[in-house]
A protein has these predicted regions:
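Catalytic cores of secreted/periplasmic lytic hydrolases that degrade extracellular macromolecules
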Residues: 2-217
Length: 217
C-alpha cells in the first residue's frame, strides 16, 4: 500500500501508479492547487509570454477530470496533472490554443491540420481538425476532457469503451491497446522521446498538488 503523499519520504514510490484506479486527490485538492499557482502562472506569462498574457483556468476543470475519470476507471487526478503539464497550467503557449479545449495535445504532431484528417466516427459537431490549426478542437471543455480520458483508456486497457460512452477521440484506434498500464509506461509513447515523461507528471504536478502548502510558488 502506498503511503499518504504528505508522509512520503521519496516521490519515486509513486512511479508504480497505474493509469486505471481510484483517485487519490479530490477535485477540491486540485482546485486548491490551481488557485495557489495562479500568481506564479500570471508572473510566468507576464515575463515570458507577454504577448499572450494570462488565460483564466477552465471552469470546473478539476471536477470534470475527477468525475469523467470515474466513468472510465481512470485516475482523473493524474490525468489532470498530465493536462497541467501538457498545457503549461492551461496557458497554451505552444501550438495548441486555449479555445480548442484540447488538454493533452491530442492530434498535434507539429504539422498543421489539412482538414482531411479522419474523424473515425466522432461526431463532427463535437470535435474537428480545423485547417491550419494544430490538433483537435472540441466545442466544450467537457468533450475535451473526456477525449483525453479516452486516449488514456486506450493506452491502459484492452476493454471496449464503457456502456453509454460516446467516442470522442478519433485517434483511439491508433493506439496499441493496453500497452501502457502505468503512467511511466507513457514514456516514449505519449511523448517522443519522452524520457521521464510519466515521472514528471507524478513528481512535478500531481505530487506537488498533493503536498500543497501555503508557501507554494
Amino acid at each position: 500500500m502506498l503511503p499518504d503523499p504528505s508522509d512520503a519520504e521519496d516521490v519515486s514510490v509513486y512511479y508504480s501508479l497505474t493509469i486505471q484506479g481510484e483517485n487519490i486527490a479530490t477535485a477540491d485538492d486540485l482546485q486548491a492547487y490551481l488557485d495557489a499557482k495562479e500568481d506564479y502562472v500570471r508572473r510566468l506569462m507576464a515575463e515570458k509570454y507577454p504577448e499572450i498574457g494570462f488565460t483564466p483556468f477552465p471552469e470546473n476543470i478539476a471536477e470534470l477530470y475527477i468525475e469523467i475519470g470515474k466513468k472510465y476507471n481512470i485516475r482523473g487526478d493524474l490525468a489532470f496533472a498530465q493536462a497541467v503539464k501538457e498545457t503549461g497550467y492551461f496557458q497554451f503557449f505552444g501550438i495548441v490554443k486555449p479555445y480548442q479545449n484540447n488538454f493533452c495535445g491530442l492530434g498535434a504532431t507539429g504539422v498543421a491540420n489539412t482538414g482531411e484528417e479522419r474523424m473515425n466516427g466522432v461526431d463532427e459537431d463535437k470535435a474537428a481538425y480545423i485547417p491550419g490549426m494544430h490538433g483537435l478542437s472540441y466545442t466544450t471543455v467537457e468533450y475535451g476532457v473526456e477525449a483525453h480520458i479516452q486516449h488514456l483508456y486506450a493506452y491502459a486497457t484492452t476493454e471496449t469503451l464503457p456502456d453509454d460512452c460516446e467516442l470522442l477521440d478519433p485517434r483511439f484506434g491508433y493506439v496499441k491497446r493496453g500497452i501502457a498500464p502505468l503512467w511511466t509506461d507513457l514514456n516514449g509513447r505519449w511523448a517522443v522521446p519522452g524520457n521521464g515523461y510519466g515521472e514528471s507528471i507524478i513528481e512535478h504536478y500531481w505530487f506537488e498538488a498533493m503536498t500543497l502548502d501555503e508557501n507554494i510558488m
